[in-house]
Amino acid sequence: MFKHKLTNLIAAAAVAITATFSLSHARADELATLKDSGELRVAMSGQYPPFSFTNDQNQVVGFDASIGEAIAERLGVKAKIITTPFDGIIAGLLAKKYDAVVASMTITPEREKAVDFVGPYYHAGRAIVVKADSSIQKLEDLNGKIVGVTLGDAHEKWAKAQGNLTVRSYKGLPEMLVDLDAGRINALVMDSVPVMVAVKETGQKIRILDTPNIEGGRVALGIAIRKNNPELKAKMQKVLEDMLADGAYEKISMKWIGSDIR
């Protein structure tokens, strides 16, 4: 009887060890799979200049695209840029349509329940943008006004939570700026960096409200990957830290933004 119980215990322990090893191996598989495939599929909207947009050669370029390509290169693989609407970008990641999201995504507790983040890879501030000659001077002046936001981003959620704004959602910044200039919206709410870069190119006259205490005034943005991939996360984090340390990140940031936005 004792021998039989001992045999059962040994068998059970073996199963447990095998299961633990299999789980550990499965969690490491994604990094190995990427290296085997030779490709890192990177998702972004393609509608968010200067972070991701389509150039005259029909190529998706920008800060996010360059960061994704640089990370892939240091992982020893090639980057495949995939554009997809931002509001469904996490769902696409979980469905394994791509391997990472480099799309200026704000790190939030809600998103951290669904995905893991590498980074932050830059920081930005929430901006309330109006036309230069607008009568809107402070946050309270937005009461009852129409504001534009990017569909699915953290600023859309913030604007809708205010309860006193009419919120109009857009796929990207260019359409928002056109509607702001035409008076179809009174303001737009989004990260400050892309707005400043965009209007520098278009010559559009805008003003950013002074809102030092606004929620999300300075936020961290990260690279999203699927959960339970500790080796992939650690490797990508190390690659990003190396880029920050050796000047590669600053070079990309200066090219697309004109300043170091880490």
Task: Identify the residue ranges that each predicted region occupies.
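Sec/Tat signal peptide C-region and signal peptidase I cleavage site
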Residues: 21-28
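Extracytoplasmic small-molecule ligand-binding "clamshell" domains
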Residues: 29-104
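Alpha-to-beta junction loops
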Residues: 40-41, 76-78, 95-103, 146, ...
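Ligand-binding cleft/hinge of the Venus flytrap
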Residues: 52-56, 68-77, 139, 152-171, ...
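Short helix-initiation/N-cap motifs at beta->coil->alpha
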Residues: 65, 81-91, 134, 153, ...
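Extended ligand-binding regions for polar small-molecule ligands
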Residues: 66-74, 146, 151-153, 218-259
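Periplasmic-binding protein-like
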Residues: 123-130, 192, 196, 200-241, ...
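Flexible hinge/capping segments at coil-to-helix
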Residues: 130-147
